Amino acid sequence: PGYYLPTRTGNILRAAERRPADKYGLDTIICWPRLWPALPDTHRTDLLAARTSLDTAATTTLWALLFSAYTPYTLLAIPLALAIATLTVTLVIPSRAQAFGDLIEAAYDTHRTTLYTQLRWPLPSTPADEKAAGQALTAYLWRGSDHTTPTFTQPNP
């Protein structure tokens, strides 16, 4: 209940943000700045393209609404602007948000072990251990730790 947002797009993006935490214990907000540099260029390019596409759709909506200011010049401005804004908000933006969210989730699905390795954090040994390990890594990145466990792994030569 506390995760719902007022718009469909907000809920799509929130769900994409929550899935890595639900599956792997990795908080997207805290871990993302550390995962981003570890992603291959192809994945980063895809993410940037999806984000740009989402931003462009949002900008189109704004411009459509601003276009309605031309009402004194033509009466068609309001219905045309509202039609474009409505279509963009109800169809285009949610589909682009879904594509962007899917790529974020895929980044965690396929590159989370790289995150552990680059931070010299021990990899979880089983899928059952992964959520607790992810929560511990997230807590360490968020607040640091003065515990003696876990022991950092040695970097590969």
Language model features: what each stretch is:
Residues 3-4, 24, 70-73, 108, ...:
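Sequence-level detector for tyrosine residue identity
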